[in-house]
């Protein structure tokens, strides 16, 4: 869960009227500094879902790299026995 929050913190919204983190967008809308009608929610949702999918793929790549590294360390250690 904490790792998912890290990915969510990295997501940036890019719109004509706003560019920045999602939580800042929500803050500005709540303070009525941005008009909710200028925000294409469907576009943000679609882009966020793509971002999450890319993050999951990256996470698997990192996990795969770790497994290879750990296996290599085990081979080296077993040769030293």
Question: What does each model-found stretch correspond to?
Answer:
Residues 1-81:
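Long, charge-dense, low-complexity tracts
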């Amino acid at each position: 869960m904490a790792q998912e929050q890290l990915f969510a913190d990295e997501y940036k919204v890019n719109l004509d009227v706003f560019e920045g983190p999602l939580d800042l967008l929500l803050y500005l809308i709540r303070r009525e500094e941005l008009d909710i009608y200028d925000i294409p929610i469907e576009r943000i949702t679609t882009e966020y879902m793509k971002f999450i999918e890319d993050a999951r793929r990256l996470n698997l790549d990192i996990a795969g790299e770790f497994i290879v590294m750990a296996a290599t360390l085990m081979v080296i250690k077993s040769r030293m026995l």
